[in-house]
């Protein structure tokens, strides 16, 4: 079976290629520039065209049995025009799905985001039956892409992962790692809000699982570790991985909220101080197994 992966050199793409090869698939990686580092031996590297050009994809889809679509503009929070999110994440994804349908591709797995369903915080545990309420251009572009893909004739599965962690991740997780490495006590013991996270390896396993499970066709799934964690638990797990005790002390949450407002970064408080729990039960019910101990997984990650 031949699988074409877009975004193959990215954070999820790297472990996914290994998982697909380990399962015996012939893997084709669509890349926009020569990959660094070089992709695993046996991966067929093909030039990835502009996402918005459906016609340019047709030659690359000949003989392909399944497409895993990872490529897109990530949620950066700043500096990306709304129209750019729509062009790449919605229009580009829809163009690829239409091209795959015309080429007779049998499966299409679209990696969306929990932000297609919710803002950075939610008042209840999210499930797939909730009405989607994205709060930013990134989330709206992903939700619109889901609808456009469903409107094609291709058998598709949509995955909505929460924030991920794993080797090589930058952004917020990397900032927390740098914070955990400081030889200082940290004032986060009082932040008890919980957030769902997702091991990148578990994400790769989820993609492989839905490819191998026909009853997931036509469905949308939240992807998350089994148990949400607090920021205090995350930092304690990180410090355990580098051989330190937690060294956390309490500071009232209101102080963090005021500090974030003072520097014009209320988005930081939304991400760190808000609660976002996403329930992966639907995907688990059809046989997928998540990471059950997020704290231990983070400790292992930093200890490696």
Predicted regions and their residues:
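N-terminal Rossmann NAD(P)H-binding glycine-rich loop of SDR-like oxidoreductase domains
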Residues: 3-23
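Conserved Rossmann-fold NAD(P)-dependent oxidoreductase catalytic core, especially the SDR/UDP-sugar
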Residues: 94-137, 157
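Amphipathic terminal alpha-helices
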Residues: 292-304
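Glycine-rich Rossmann NAD(P)(H)-binding loop
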Residues: 166, 188-194, 221-228, 237-243, ...
